[in-house]
Amino acid sequence: MNLPRAERPRSTPQRSLRDSDGEDGKIDVLGEEEDEDEVEDEEEEARQQFLEQSLQPGLQVARWGGVALPREHIEGGGGPSDPSEFGTKFRAPPRSAAASEDARQPAKPPYSYIALITMAILQNPHKRLTLSGICAFISGRFPYYRRKFPAWQNSIRHNLSLNDCFVKIPREPGHPGKGNYWSLDPASQDMFDNGSFLRRRKRFKRHQLTPGAHLPHPFPLPAAHAALHNPHPGPLLGAPAPPQPVPGAYPNTAPGRRPYALLHPHPLRYLLLSARVYAGAPKKAEGADLATPAPFPCCSPHLVLSLGRRARVWRRHREADASLSALRVLCKGSGERVQGLRRVCPRPRGATATCSSDHQACCIPKPLPLCCKCPPPLLLGQFCSNSSSIRRTAPTAALPPRARCWAGTCRPRRRC
């Protein structure tokens, strides 16, 4: 930077003077040289002050030959810059603590939540675990899940509830504790390809129960309840058909073994117990005394017990027909006819009585011939005798009019 410098005084030639003796002598001029050094020092101090003022923060204005210039122009003119500011601008930022923690965190395992749950269940000797046991196995086996425990625990719970390959098992009596057990469905053993937990086949779906299939009950049910639970009882008074196994749900087993014992090596008595079946059993038990699963070979197979609208009709007249439940029916060899028989069962082939379908509660009463092919609906559980006539030992006078008609003692002209 060119700054105006003060003019130096011209040095005067040394004059020779003669002393008193007449000899020429030189005069010492050291005082002039000291003045020049002081001027140079003052210029250096002024220059340093100017540079310090130009480097102060904010917009500075410097006087340069009477012209006001901003600080940026002064610095861009080639002036020296502060080395401390240069170091802060181009210094590398320090590494954050979060980045260092991420570098030390273990990698996430390449397994899905279904694979992790399957690993936990299979390593257990009883092949079943609670939710807390599954989470404890995963966090102990894979360090990645130790720090994010609350987040992935919810994912484990959702996968257990939403996937059909996992079955909830209630706790057995006498084994207190918190939470239910979770196990694998027997049909989902080959869920993973070649036993590798990295590759899973298509989503497993549990087989829906067919109409003729039966759920295995942990406790034996009465005969009436078993008949009510069967959606298709088949012949009304015939022998109950054996339960048909669900196709694909259970493996083939030897005869005489319980099907629910094959679901797992340990007892799973409450695996497929349906609460809705037991909830509807008391309501259906009212009509259980109307039909008993006893063999009745002489009856037509077309007679099927209706537990719908016709069952409600039976309950209406149950009090009036209570005394008729023990009567025997006149069978072969008897030519008598029963008057005023109200049809409740479906119409067999060749019957003359017809049933209206316009939401009527009962059928049209018409006389029907008495034979073994169409027994009275209220006596479905009685055996048909081969004798010509069997009458009740009690006197018929004590019976209501309808009962006397059933016994064949009323007049033909009178209709009950």
Curated annotation (Swiss-Prot):
One of its GO terms (molecular function) is RNA polymerase II cis-regulatory region sequence-specific DNA binding. The keyword tRNA processing does not apply. It comes from Homo sapiens (Human). GO terms for cellular component: chromatin; nucleus. This is Forkhead box protein D4-like 4. Gene3D superfamilies: Winged helix-like DNA-binding domain superfamily/Winged helix DNA-binding domain. The keyword Disulfide bond does not apply. GO terms for biological process: anatomical structure morphogenesis; cell differentiation; regulation of transcription by RNA polymerase II. Keywords: DNA-binding, Nucleus, Transcription, Transcription regulation. The gene is FOXD4L4. It is found in: Nucleus. Residues 1-55, 70-105 are annotated as: Disordered. Residues 108-202 bind DNA. Residues 30-45 have a biased composition (Acidic residues). Residues 1-29 have a biased composition (Basic and acidic residues). InterPro entries: Fork_head_dom, FOX_domain-containing, TF_fork_head_CS_1, TF_fork_head_CS_2, WH-like_DNA-bd_sf, WH_DNA-bd_sf.
